[in-house]
Swiss-Prot record:
Its EC number is 2.7.2.3. ATP binds at K198, E320, G346, G347, D348, T349. Monomer. SUPFAM superfamilies: Phosphoglycerate kinase (SSF53748). Its main location: cytoplasm. This is Phosphoglycerate kinase. PROSITE patterns: PGLYCERATE_KINASE (PS00111). The gene is pgk. It catalyses: (2R)-3-phosphoglycerate + ATP = (2R)-3-phospho-glyceroyl phosphate + ADP. InterPro entries: Phosphoglycerate_kinase, Phosphoglycerate_kinase_CS, Phosphoglycerate_kinase_N, Phosphoglycerate_kinase_sf. GO terms for cellular component: cytosol. It is found in: Cytoplasm. Substrate binds at D21, M22, N23, R36, H59, L60, G61, R62, R114, R147.
Length: 397
């Protein structure tokens, strides 16, 4: 991937427009988790430290275009950002009619981009209006990189200079390191409730990895493909043949899809359900598999400890219930102990990492969500493609 980076730009005396992802959750009218705001600070501070004025734009929630309601207002986000920066951050509601006059060190925020007509349809005129505000456009919203919208793609086409922010560049560099030029052996963990939601990821990674670990309901479908009885466990019978193809593809290249030989089962899916460890051959018709067993966890942990690269998306058991958390904990700790470069993404994965206290030991934790998954699928991310295109158009590569 060839794109300009903010940290390569001379921004002194310039106005920088940063598309951030500050779509934070609220509880009781207050921001309940400011992780996304803090993740964007590096780019804002870089600009301020280097003599620029900054305009931040972000989406918040899912407002209807052309309508504005109190819950759509980014004012609380601007106030929180201002608190972190130690300066006032004003919200601009009429920025199209009144272009702001800014001095070096100023920070302002545009009102919620998703109330603007044409935002979701990637309207070029709206993109030009955004671009007219700045000398340099910075996309630092990796979480929206898989969407072609006016504040992520059209603006990049129209801006004098378009580059990746600190967070965006970090995400892309880490993903590139993990998937484009991985240290071997490369091991991926893909887990979740359904094969159907991760089928393209499984197929894409099967072309790249040396070992493909599956977990959760996905593993149950693969167990069915191996002819194993899984009781009343969640599985997709219509995707057994697809699972067989993926296993055959891995075997043909000398790899494998290592499936559990022992599992943790219960009669019901509940926080107080009794957990029983069983050999996979002994799962009864009225039981459901809710985690991998200790023998399987130990074997998979050995694979991870010996890996050169690990890509992790999804817990291998119902880790929210402690009695079914052993498998995910064992794998998380193995990744933490491994010398491999590791990258992890997805909401449940990040929650598991936090629960088991291995955040500092993971090589890179992606904030991307849907963008992370689409990158794993091998899809082009529109916002990233726009940055690459503008670099080529400007004759910079």
């Amino acid at each position: 991937m060839a794109f300009l980076k903010l940290t390569e730009q001379n921004v002194r005396g310039k106005t920088v427009l940063i598309r951030a992802d500050m779509n934070v959750p609220f509880k009781g009218g207050k921001i309940s988790d400011d992780t996304r705001i803090r993740a964007s600070l590096a780019s804002v501070k870089y600009c301020l430290d280097n003599g620029a004025s900054v305009i931040v734009m972000t989406h918040l929630g899912r407002p209807t275009e052309g309508e504005f309601h109190p819950e759509d207002d980014v004012a609380p986000v601007a106030a929180h950002l201002g608190g972190l920066l130690g300066k006032d951050v004003k919200v601009l509601n009429d920025w199209r009619e009144n272009k702001p006059a800014l001095n070096a060190g100023d920070v302002v925020m545009l009102q919620n981009v998703r109330i603007n007509k044409g935002e979701k349809k990637n309207d070029l005129e709206l993109g030009k209006a955004y671009a007219a505000l700045c000398d340099v456009f910075v996309n630092d919203a990796f979480g929206t990189a898989h969407r072609a919208q006016a504040s992520t793609e059209a603006v990049a086409q129209a801006a004098p200079v378009a580059c990746a922010g600190v967070l965006m560049a970090g995400e892309l560099d880490a993903l590139g390191k993990a998937l484009k030029q991985p240290a071997r052996p490369m091991v991926a963990i893909v887990a979740g409730s359904k094969v159907s939601t991760k089928l393209t990821i499984l197929e894409s990674l099967a072309d790249k990895v040396d070992q493909l670990i599956v977990g959760g309901g996905i593993a149950n479908t693969f167990l069915l493909a191996e002819g194993k009885a899984i009781g009343k466990s969640l599985a997709e019978h219509d995707l057994v043949e697809e699972s067989k193809k993926i296993m055959a593809k891995m075997a043909a290249k000398g790899g494998s899809v290592p499936l559990p030989t022992d599992v943790v089962v219960a009669k019901a899916f509940a926080a107080d359900a009794e957990a029983v460890v069983k050999d996979i051959a002994d799962v009864a018709e009225d039981e459901m598999i809710l985690d991998i067993g200790p023998k399987s966890a130990a074997a998979l942990a050995d694979l991870l400890k010996a890996a050169g690269t690990v890509v992790w998306n999804g817990p291998v058991g119902v880790f929210e219930f402690d009695q079914f958390a052993g498998g995910t904990k064992a794998l998380a700790e193995a990744i933490a102990q491994s010398k491999a470069f590791s990258i992890a993404g997805g909401g449940d994965t990040l929650a598991a990492i936090a629960k088991f206290g291995v955040t500092e030991q993971i090589g890179y934790i992606s904030t991307g969500g849907g963008a992370f998954l689409e990158f794993l699928e091998g899809k082009e991310l529109p916002a990233v493609a726009a940055l690459e295109k503008t670099r080529r158009v400007n004759g910079l590569i």
